[in-house]
Design a protein with these regions (language model features):
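Metal- or metallocofactor-binding catalytic centers and their adjacent structured scaffolds
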Residues: 32-107
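Metal-dependent enolase-superfamily TIM-barrel catalytic cores that perform enediolate-based chemistry
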Residues: 117-225
């Protein structure tokens, strides 16, 4: 089997994200073969990511054997090394890598979860991300809930955040997990202070309180906070996760399979984390791409759900009673009609 074409588009759906995600949004990559099989993957980088796929990566992949996934990943990384290593180039590679895995599953008539040693139909608990405590009332049944918070600019804002977190715990009761997402907008002092005040609310983790580049800051938090710290959503490649894992700067690692380098790199991250006795909980885990890895590789499966960014993706399993089931269809189990996709201008 040989690759005959590599295509990339940026679809739009009814709930397509606004602002920066419109231009740096998710891109759909299709890899066609002479066997008549097409593999699909989703990466990031918007129009810039498309350009990387359609030029550098397409030139490298045409005529190649799509079954050599690991070798092709290494070659794509080398081909983009001068302008890549993180960000848009790795987001583009992520989508191509996922398309190659989708092809592999379709060729073998197996779901990706089976290729990874897991079982189709595996059910996993979910946690739901909300942007306010008011959203909790309409979030449905889940094993946990994550409250997305903003920047701490003044002491009174800190008090308001602590109060919001307390209200969230009261709202959901004592049984469900409760997480807090700072989205890289806190500082060391605020994180230590807030962590101290919310510890009694049974917080599963504080997510990304600092910039992903502030490893020194995370080292301080590791020593001075008792609430677990999660992060890695905005990190790229297994090599970049290595210091986080070796220094145990995060208790919970959150790679995004559509950004971090694809499934090939996510497998490496899981392997390193297991050796270090650290937990992996992929970002956007309920989306069809990450579910197969979570079902096959995760001893503590927990899948994140939230706003439906990729509404043009069909075949996504439904959440029922707080559980989600991995597909048993070949590949990732993606279903859609290419001719019906809307494109971002």
């Amino acid at each position: 089997m040989q690759i005959t074409d590599v295509r990339a588009i940026q679809p739009a759906g009814n709930n397509s994200p606004p602002d920066w995600r419109t231009s740096l949004g998710q891109i759909l990559i299709a890899i066609d073969t002479d066997a008549g099989i097409t593999g699909y993957g989703v990466g990031g980088g918007g129009l810039a990511g498309q350009h990387v796929v359609k030029t550098v990566l397409r030139d490298l992949l045409l005529g190649r054997n799509p079954e050599q996934i690991s070798q092709l990943w290494d070659e794509m990384y080398q081909a983009t090394l001068a302008f890549g290593r993180k960000g848009i180039a790795i987001m583009a590679i992520s989508g191509v890598d996922l398309a190659l895995w989708d092809l592999q599953g379709k060729r073998e008539q197996q779901p990706v979860v089976t290729l990874l040693g897991g079982t189709p139909g595996t059910k996993m608990p979910t946690y739901h991300t909300v942007w306010s405590t008011q959203d909790l009332a309409t979030s449905g049944e889940h094993a946990g809930y994550k409250l997305h918070l903003g920047k701490v600019a003044a002491p009174e804002q800190r008090d308001l955040m602590v109060s919001s977190i307390e209200q969230a715990r009261i709202s959901i009761g004592s049984a469900p997990l409760l997480m807090v997402d700072a989205w890289m907008k806190w500082d060391i002092e605020s994180t230590i202070s807030i962590a101290r005040e919310i510890k009694s609310f049974q917080i599963e983790w504080i997510e990304e309180p600092l910039s992903p580049d502030d490893l020194a800051g995370y080292a301080i938090l590791k020593e001075q906070t008792e609430v677990p710290i999660a992060g890695g959503e905005h990190e790229f490649t297994a090599d970049a996760f290595r210091p986080l894992i070796e220094q145990k700067l995060h208790t919970v690692l959150q790679p995004d399979v559509n950004w971090c380098g694809g499934l090939t790199e996510l497998i490496k991250i899981y392997t390193m984390a297991k050796q270090a006795d650290l937990r992996v909980c992929p970002h956007r885990g309920c989306e069809i791409w990450a579910l197969h890895a979570i079902a096959a590789l995760d001893p503590q499966p927990l899948a994140e759900t939230g706003r439906p960014w990729m509404t043009w993706v069909k075949g996504q399993p439904d959440i029922q009673e707080g559980m989600i089931e991995v597909s048993d269809r070949p590949g990732f189990g993606l279903l859609f009609d290419e001719a019906q996709l809307q494109l971002v201008n």
